Regions:
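N-terminal amphipathic/basic-hydrophobic helices that include classical n-h-c signal peptides
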Residues: 1-19
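Acidic/polar residues at beta-strand termini and the immediately following turn/coil
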Residues: 9, 24-26, 154
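N-terminal auxiliary segments of SAM/dcSAM-dependent transferases
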Residues: 17-50
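Residues that form generic nucleotide/phosphate-binding pockets
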Residues: 35, 39-42, 56-60, 89, ...
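Membrane-proximal envelope and lipid/glycan-remodeling enzymes
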Residues: 41-42, 63-65, 175
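Short, compositionally biased "basic patch" segments
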Residues: 47-63, 131-137
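Non-catalytic interaction surface on structured domains
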Residues: 50-54, 65, 71-72, 103
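S-adenosylmethionine/decaboxylated-SAM
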Residues: 69-272
């Protein structure tokens, strides 16, 4: 007789041991997904929960919380919720090319490349002003290196942009992640230059929008640079959204992102 914990009894935690009963349990996958969507939308409207989450994130940032995580042995410098959200987006949309500005230690490009490896196609193009030799060595010696291309140079420099475009085959589905310099003007320039590369149905992700929710008196001081409200990614994103009708803020993904450094930063491309 089989022993399993079935979805139909998950609220009580009861075990089902009757195989015939197992076969009669309804397929509730659609209902489960619909309920998750409903709760995500509701969570995204709960400002009190968001405030509590912000307080918690600022508290753990004293320990440089985002720096404590790695992916396949490489520091990723992201919060777990953002890693999960990016995974959901990539698996759902299956981009052929993912462009990320801001390589840092390489964990993020390795992470996205590993998902493309599971999908069975595609590559990640990592762009950074300064790719340190030891970080390059880590990335280029990694098992996922075959799906990674590194471009060193200012992300919005015409020569860099030309090299990035050269990595995009015709008719590719293109996703973009912006995670380099977080000043308003730089992010806005990246949005204007990289936004047009994103194809319909794919995502444009603007990292570290959380800074736009933090008062200057509470802004983390343990960084090489400090950004404040008005000079950060969220302000740039809002300006960009007023300039284009190609993108919308995904309410489901962003609704879940309360313990996140990028709330409101996941934009879905809705027009060619």
């Amino acid at each position: 007789m089989g022993l399993s914990l079935r979805a139909g009894n998950s609220e009580t935690g009861d075990f089902v041991t009757d195989r015939e009963t197992d076969l009669k349990i309804a397929d509730d996958r659609g209902q489960f997904a619909a309920r998750a969507r409903e709760l995500s939308l509701a969570l995204g409207k709960d400002q009190e929960v968001f405030k509590q989450a912000l307080d918690a994130l600022l508290a753990v940032d004293n320990y440089r919380y985002a720096y404590l995580w790695s992916w396949m042995g490489v520091p990723i410098i992201q919060l777990p919720a953002d890693i999960m959200a990016t995974q959901e987006v990539i698996v759902a949309t299956k981009p052929d090319v993912i462009i990320e500005t801001g390589v840092a230690r390489g964990g993020s490009v390795v992470f996205m490349a590993s998902l493309l490896e599971l999908i069975g196609r595609g590559k990640v193009v990592g762009v950074d002003l300064d790719i340190r030799p030891h970080n390059r060595q880590t990335i280029e010696s990694h098992p996922m290196a075959k799906r990674i291309r590194l471009i060193e140079g200012p992300s919005t420099d015409p020569e860099t942009l030309a090299r990035v475009r050269g990595e995009i085959p015709p008719d590719s589905n293109v996703m973009v992640v912006l995670d380099s310099d977080h000043s308003r003007d730089h992010v806005l320039s990246e949005l204007r230059n990289y936004g047009p590369l994103v194809t319909k149905g794919q995502y444009l992700v603007v990292a570290d929008t959380l800074v736009g929710h933090i008062d200057e008196s509470r802004a983390p001081k343990n960084r090489s640079k400090t950004w404040f409200k008005g000079d950060e990614p969220l302000t740039a994103l809002n300006i960009f959204l007023q300039e284009t009708n190609r993108f919308e803020v995904d309410p489901v993904i962003n609704g879940k992102l309360v313990f996140s450094s990028s709330p409101g930063g996941y934009l879905r491309c809705i027009a060619p």
